[in-house]
Amino acid sequence: DNPDHVGHKEGHDTPAYYHKLEEIDGYIGKVMNAVKEAGILDETIFIITSDHGGINKGHGGKTMQEMETPFIISGKNIKKGHEIQASMMQFDVAATVAAIFKLKQPQVWIGRPIMEVFK
């Protein structure tokens, strides 16, 4: 089960939802430890994000609580402890990943890389 399903079934901002987030946090820790054990931690960038916020059992919406999502980025050439000041949209995530890999964005993309996170 994933946090999205729990949020829609049990509700966002509920004990069940936060329990699921704690479970996911444990999985993230396992991935990070595996990357460290593989000796590639210094060459890795982690991105953790979500596709939408939520109120009650809803799916997105027009309020900030429903539209705002976390965007956590950490790793090689990423500023530590930086808080993004620019407005950011979901389609900027793909543009940021493209910038990490030095890929040219397709002309039709409307996203822009969040350059302020880079050292």
What spans do the regions from the language model cover?
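Solvent-exposed loop/turn segments at secondary-structure junctions
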Residues: D1-D4, H52-I55, N77-K79
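Short, flexible, mixed-charge acidic loops at enzyme active sites
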Residues: D1, V6-K9, G61-P70
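Substrate-binding rim/cap in mid-to-C-terminal beta-strand-loop elements of soluble/periplasmic
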Residues: K62-K104, M115
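Active-site His/acidic residue clusters
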Residues: D1-E23, K30
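Glycine-centered flexibility sites
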Residues: G29, G53-G54, G75, K102, ...
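Secreted, luminal/periplasmic, and some membrane-associated catalytic domains
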Residues: M32, E37, E43, M88, ...
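Solvent-exposed, acidic/flexible segments
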Residues: T14-Y17, L21-I24, M64, A86-Q90, ...
